[in-house]
């Protein structure tokens, strides 16, 4: 065969080979994308029990934590179905706060709230007198605070960027009443012994730093159905179980002569279907809306701690 005829054949073969390689690469990329595409239940990572040490200022009223805390458009006076039944397995006794006359805003203003992102939501929802700057709200960096790290991580008051250890802060402020709402992020990952030991460490820190402070161990709030189903590690049965542990912890301190009480706000935010009604959530199924916070605050005022 003449050289002049060989060259076109070689070039055609090379072009054909390059086309085959290109098509193979395209099919490989498409296959890889399909295999790794997010699907419900597989793209959610399990939350860490660690709460990072602050590396940047705590969010101000114009900033928000990782999870959105904006309130849906719902009237705070809207009536929604609630179960009205106490959380399962909560022991009965005088340590469980009973309904009283409304103690009023003066009573509410004497309270300090310590909690995770479900408490931090009080700031952007502006449900307290000082709104987004309220020093009544104690939280961790970025608005989050995990139960195992409450006594070792820095705590921030309101929009302040000055963090202090919990014991240090309480020694200075010595609040009359402290409402603790903690445990939602670890309600499924810790057994009763470990959960209770972390919770007791928080209470012991409060009592040693401010002995006259009355402590309200507030129940963990329920979640909406969509959150329960999409985050299988965060569900109402586990939350109810953890609330029973919190109740037992409060009972132990109360029976030893300490002014430690339990408040069941869980059942007040639980719908008849076993989930938190969606208007009580800010839209993510976990954090509360302004309407829900107003219910919680109203419950605190109408379940006054004994003098």
Report the location of each language-model feature.
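Active-site segments of SGNH/GDSL-like serine hydrolases
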Residues: 181-185, 207-240
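Histidine-centered active-site loop/cap adjacent to the catalytic His
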Residues: 280-307
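Generic structural signal for well-ordered alpha-helices
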Residues: 199-204, 243, 247
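Loop/turn elements at helix/coil->beta-strand transitions in domains of secreted/extracellular proteins
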Residues: 107-110, 133, 173-178, 210-216, ...
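Extracytoplasmic/secreted cell-surface and envelope-processing proteins
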Residues: 122, 187-192, 224-232, 270-274
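Substrate-gating cap/lid alpha-helix
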Residues: 224-265, 286, 291
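N-terminal secretory targeting modules
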Residues: 1-114, 118-124
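Conserved SGNH/GDSL esterase-like catalytic core that processes O-acyl groups on lipids
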Residues: 104-197
């Amino acid at each position: 065969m003449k050289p002049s005829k060989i060259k076109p054949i070689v070039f055609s073969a090379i072009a054909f080979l390059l086309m085959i390689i290109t098509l193979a690469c395209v099919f490989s990329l498409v296959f890889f994308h399909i295999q790794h595409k997010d699907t419900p239940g597989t793209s959610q990572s399990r939350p860490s029990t660690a709460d990072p040490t602050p590396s940047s200022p705590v969010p101000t009223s114009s900033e928000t934590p990782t999870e959105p805390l904006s309130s849906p458009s719902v009237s705070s006076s809207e009536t929604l179905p609630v179960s009205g039944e106490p959380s399962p397995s909560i022991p009965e006794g005088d340590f469980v706060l009973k309904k009283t006359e409304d103690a009023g805003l003066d009573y509410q203003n004497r309270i300090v709230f310590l909690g995770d992102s479900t408490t931090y939501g009080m700031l952007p929802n502006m449900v307290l007198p000082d709104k987004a700057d309220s020093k009544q709200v104690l939280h961790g960096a970025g608005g989050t605070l995990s139960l195992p790290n409450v006594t070792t991580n820095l705590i921030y008051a309101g929009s302040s960027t000055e963090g202090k250890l919990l014991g240090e802060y309480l020694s200075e402020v010595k609040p009359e009443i402290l409402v603790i709402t903690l445990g939602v992020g670890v309600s499924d990952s810790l057994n009763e012994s470990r959960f209770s030991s972390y919770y007791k460490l928080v209470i012991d820190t409060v009592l040693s730093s401010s002995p006259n402070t009355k402590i309200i161990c507030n129940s963990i709030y329920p979640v909406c159905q969509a959150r329960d189903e999409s985050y299988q590690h965060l569900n109402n049965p586990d939350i109810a179980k953890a609330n029973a542990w919190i109740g037992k912890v409060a009972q132990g301190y109360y029976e030893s002569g300490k002014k430690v009480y339990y408040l069941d706000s869980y059942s007040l935010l639980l719908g008849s279907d076993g989930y938190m009604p969606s208007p009580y959530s800010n839209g993510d199924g976990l954090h509360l809306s302004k309407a829900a916070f107003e219910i919680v605050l109203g419950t605190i005022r109408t379940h006054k701690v004994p003098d």
